[in-house]
Amino acid sequence: KEAAFGPALQPYDFIYVDDLIEAVYRLGFKETNKPFYYIGSGNPKVLKDYLIRIGELVGCADKVGIGVREDDGVKYTMDMFDNSNLVSTIGEYASIDFDKGINKTINWLKNSLML
C-alpha cells in the first residue's frame, strides 16, 4: 500500500533517540541561560528527501506517494531547527547520522515485529 504525503517541501529534522538522550543528559548537568533549546541532528533537510531515503532503505521507494495529498499548511523554516545554542552549551552530541539511525530503527522493528 502506498503511503500518501503532501508535497513535503517543508524543512524537517530527525534525531536518533540515543543522541536525544545524550543531549538531555548533558543539559541536566549544565547551568543554562536560555529558556529553551532545540534538540535536533543539526542537519535539517526538506522532508521529501527524508521520505524518499526511508523508502529506498526499506526497499519500497515506489510506495512513497509524495504529492498525493494536499499540503497540510504547516510551515517551518530552517532557522527553527538551529541547534547552535545547544551545541555551544553542551558540545556536539549528535553522533548517529540519518541513514544509520533509520537502519537501526528498521532492524529493531524487524526483530520486534518478527517481519
In which residue ranges do the predicted regions lie?
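C-terminal substrate-binding subdomain of Rossmann-fold SDR/epimerase-dehydratase oxidoreductases
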Residues: K1-L115
